[in-house]
Structure formats: C-alpha cells, structure tokens
Amino acid sequence: MSRRRAVITGIGPITCIGHGRENFWNAILAEKSGIKSFDSGVFRVRAAGEINDWDPEQFFSPQRLKRLDRYAQFAVVSAKLALEDARLEYSREKPQDRVGVSFGTALGGVCKAEEQYLRYLKKGARGVQPTLAVQVFGGSAHSNIAIEFGFRGAGTTNSNSCASGTVSVGEALRYIRDDFVDVVVAGGAEAPLTTITIGAFDIIKTMSRWPENPALACRPFDLLRDGFVMGEGGASLVIEELEHARSRGAHIYAEVLGYSINNDAFHMTSPLPNGESSIRAMREALTDAQLAPEQIDYINAHASSTQLNDSAETASIKQVLGNHAQRIPVSGTKGYYAHPLGATGAIEAALCALALDRQWVPPTINYTNHDPLCDLDVVPNHGREAELTYIMSNSFGFGGINACVVLGKAPQ
C-alpha cells in the first residue's frame, strides 16, 4: 500500500532579517546578519536576533492582544503569511475538520510571565492581568492558530527545546501519512528575549559574549565561535497531502520525505560524546525517506555556534555519510537570524524548502577561521547555485533531543 505524501505549499517566516517569504529569501541572498546590539542588563550577553519592527496592532485588535503573548503573535501571523502564500481559503465561520496545526516552542509565553510577575511584585495579585493563564501556556500557539482560522483537525504544540520546530514539521508528515488530516499548518515560534531567559542561559555559559561587532557574534563552524546568540521569531509552513495540493493547482516548494526524533538519555546540556543518538536520528530519517546517505545533496546543520555542538555534529555527519560528507555542502545559517530556540527548526525547514525551489545553497556567514574539527564544505560566506534533489535539516536541543527531517525536490 502506497503512503500518503506530504508537500510544502506555503511558507511564512517572521525573523530579524525579514517577514514573509520573499523578504526572508532576499535577506538570505544579501548574506548579511540580522543580529544587532542588545542590552541584557547585568549579564554579559551583548547581541541578539531581535525583531525591532514588530507592530502587533497591525494584525490584532486591542482586545485580541490581551490574550496573546509575543510568541503567540508570531505564531498566528506566520500562519497567516503561510496560508496566504499557499492561497488556501479559510474561515472561522466555516471551520474545517481536515486541517490541523502542529506547532513548537521551547518556552511558550515567557515574555508575559516575566512581565506579569514584575507587576505582581509592584501591585500584588490584583495587578496581574486576568488573561495571564491563556497567554503563558505552551499550547496557546496551535490553539490561537486554530481559533483564528477555524481549523478543527489534529492539533498540538510540542516543547522539545531547540528541536521543537523540526518536530512540528515531522509530526505534520505523520498526520498526513496516517490520514488524520489533508492539510497541516506546521511551525514554531519563540519570544525568549527576557531577563530571566537570557540570564538562565548566560549563567551556564552557553551564549556568545562576543565583545566586538554583534553581527559577527554567531559564527557556526568558525574556530573562534564562543556560544549561541538568542533570537526571536517564528515560521509556519503549509504542509499538504500531495493530491490535495495538485487538485487545486498549488505551487509545491518541496516534499517532506522523512523524519526521526530520539533522545540521548545522557545529559541536559551536553550531547553524547560518541554522537550515537544524533547519528541514529539522521540514519532513521533517511530510512523513513527511503533514501541512501549518498543521495543527500545538502545538509542544513544545527550548527548553533558553540564549540562542542558544531564539532560533535560534524563528526556525526561524517559517520552517517562517510566519504560523501566531504562532497556536499553543509552550512549553518544561524548567523543570519540567530537562534530562536523552538522556532529555529521551522525557520530552517522553510529555508531548505526555498533552497530546493530556487536550487541555491545558503552559506555559513561570519566564517573566517578554519576549525580542523569542522572539516566539511561549510559554504563559507557566499551561497551558490547547485543541483539539489534531497536536503537534510538537523535540530539538536537541550535535554538530548535530536530531530531530523529530510526534504525532497517538488514532485513532477
């Protein structure tokens, strides 16, 4: 029995380098970072991928905004952009049972939680907004998307740290294969630029303390990398059953072919020294996609710009692909838009779909110093045209969570 196939027909990124498909893609082609100076107060972090031009009142009424944390705003608007890109019709007045939502976030409504805690300290319990409960819980992403657009199919928000966005795409594939729905809005959103979040990560010394130009702070695979740079934003993808997409003449960017998720069961912040679980995640995603390792044409690496992660991921990729790892491009793209935690995997899935659609490999920007432990073709600083048929995208998160998706060129 043939499997139902899932394709990407809509893309809606919201990042510090641009909102919407073409603004985002043009910023990628410009090969410049969106990371800027950021005041973290008493902490040593001085850079972030902050979205400075965000105006939620452009999209929501004042009454609606009272129920939306910043991360949920990103979720709903990115979904709107993706649905418009896919040219899918929707209506709250005519709910659809065969459209679902699969979303991811690491921290959920942490912005509103911190804001309201400070209000509580100043004004007591009566100073706290009565809508706080519906603003802070992690499931508000998919719930608000479903409410906004009338989607009554399968719906969930996962919280798998930095792998959350990739998990949302992979679970969307499963929803379609298993015939739960015909269309899924899949993505991730995060708004973590709060004192409590930055402080928590800065204290354990995982974040960059780059003292110079903040645009250069995130430098995946570079010898001088000194930690990840936190960002905010989101991305949604419309993932649709193939024949459903064809029946309405939709433009198909890419096909979602394979997915895997597992756990290290080792340490909350350090990967397994031998990379066993990340290796298995990549191999199982390839098996799910029914591909051999040598069929992969490009890997969008997790490449968080930490010393340990980038070198460990390099070793794992070489273990999975063997000699083929030296023949293909492997770039880390967080130098553009930083690391918006649970949103990142969705942003990078969107980027990979566009790479397949436009046949162009995005570069690793801010790369100046070769690291012998990261001895792959990292596409330094400048992207290139390439014949791309199959792409792998990795997300490896705190808690030892490893997720991988494989995308393919749009079927003819």
Residues covered by each model-derived region:
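Glycine-/small-residue-rich "gating" segment that lines the acyl/pantetheine channel
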Residues: 122-129, 170, 174, 191-247, ...
